[in-house]
Amino acid sequence: MAFKDPGKAPVDQEVAIHRIRITLTSRNVKSLEKVCADLIRGAKEKNLKVKGPVRMPTKTLRITTRKTPCGEGSKTWDRFQMRIHKRLIDLHSPSEIVKQITSISIEPGVEVEVTIADA
């Protein structure tokens, strides 16, 4: 049987490291890339393991509609489209540090989704 010495307290408390996925979506590519670069710069300053940004395929939403409201006249059509860009960033770190990193100012129009899983 092994006995612990009651005089010594544990020196290191191990912090749980999580696998964190940050998903960024936006219609504006420039603001999306700026937020992405800020997040990665903040993570690298804290010496975290970073993977990304992974550029996901752009979704293009299209709507085709008639120009004239009454239905008379020549059949002319308007075509509208909206492009949605998406980026993924993977981090390996404690969740407290991620709260500090994601507290940066995020551009308007950029949506951030954070998913936390155990490593």
UniProtKB/Swiss-Prot annotation:
PROSITE patterns: RIBOSOMAL_S10. Keywords: Cytoplasm, Ribonucleoprotein, Ribosomal protein. It is found in: Cytoplasm. One of its GO terms (cellular component) is cytosolic small ribosomal subunit. One of its GO terms (biological process) is translation. GO terms for molecular function: RNA binding; structural constituent of ribosome. The keyword Oxidoreductase does not apply. Belongs to the universal ribosomal protein uS10 family. This is Small ribosomal subunit protein uS10. It comes from Xenopus laevis. The gene is rps20.
